[in-house]
Design a protein with these regions (language model features):
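A basic, amphipathic helix-loop patch mediating RNA/tRNA/ribosome contacts
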Residues: 1-51
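S-adenosyl-L-methionine
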Residues: 107-160
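Conserved alpha-helix/loop element of class I SAM-dependent methyltransferases that forms part
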Residues: 63-82
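Core SAM-dependent methyltransferase catalytic element
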Residues: 224-241
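Conserved class I S-adenosyl-L-methionine
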Residues: 80-90
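Conserved beta-strand signature within the Rossmann-like core of class I S-adenosyl-L-methionine
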Residues: 172-187
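Conserved SAM-binding loop of SAM-dependent methyltransferases across substrates and taxa
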Residues: 91-102
């Protein structure tokens, strides 16, 4: 009998769905990847090349969806009727939260390509600005006055990313909810060692956001941890008049 070739689960998922590169770890670790009908949560699980693999890709089940949803509840922020920018949209977890909470339109901004889920691509309320850096936004790309901004900028510090949004027009009373990733804010490339690192990262992010023309209302710890258990935060701001 010929030897069955096996790969690590993460590698096999990416072989079949390369567009999931930015979310594959989250999908596996949160039980959204099924091998022969059973959820597998170890990235290194060996799977046969011909195994049946199913991936649940509903944004409501993504960790990002839960992060923003719970943060908006804690911060008392309403998205009803807003026209929003979701910077760092990726698969669209934050975008889906905004839509579920009544957003009129969401500009989903993502430097990558092919990540936004098909259901969101087909939603007439979503403007898909993939292959677009936040620094490339203009009033021509985003002609509407923006009343809400959500950010999950990956490896770009908020102090650098948020000022780049100033090329668009903001509506009076516009609000911002920015996810703080300590590794990005501190430039360490490592998970924060203790609470002081998280606090320092959040403080730096808040200072950068304030310098970009926002009044910082509140900072909180994210109620949902990031990949590999990373402690993250949120900054809530309101556009200064």
């Amino acid at each position: 009998m010929p030897k069955v070739r096996k790969r690590k689960l993460r590698d096999e998922v990416l072989r079949r769905w390369p567009e999931l590169e930015n979310v594959v770890d989250e999908l596996i670790e949160t039980g959204k990847v099924f091998v022969d009908g059973l959820p597998r949560t170890n990235l290194r699980t060996a799977v046969a090349e011909g195994a049946s693999i199913r991936v649940e890709r509903t944004p409501r089940r993504f960790r990002g969806y839960e992060k923003l949803s719970q943060a908006l509840d804690l911060l008392g922020i309403s998205a009803e009727g807003v026209t929003a920018i979701d910077a760092g949209a990726a698969a669209g977890g934050f975008t889906q939260v905004l839509l579920d909470r009544g957003a009129a339109r969401v500009y989903a901004v993502e430097v990558g390509y092919g990540q936004l889920l098909g259901s969101l691509r087909q939603d007439e309320r979503v403007v898909n600005l993939e292959r677009t850096n936040v620094g490339a936004l203009t009033r021509a790309l985003v002609p509407d006055p923006i009343s809400a901004v959500t950010l999950d900028l990956g490896y770009l510090a908020l102090a650098k990313g948020v000022p780049q949004l100033n090329a668009v027009t903001f509506a009076p009373g516009a609000w911002l909810a920015a996810l703080v990733k300590p590794m990005s804010e501190l430039g360490t490339g490592e998970l924060p060692l203790d609470d002081r690192d998280v606090d320092e990262a959040t403080e730096r992010a808040a200072e950068g956001i304030a310098a970009a023309g926002w009044r910082v209302v509140r900072t909180i710890r994210s109620p949902v941890r990031g990949t590999h258990g990373a402690i993250e935060g949120f900054v809530h701001g309101v556009r200064a008049t």
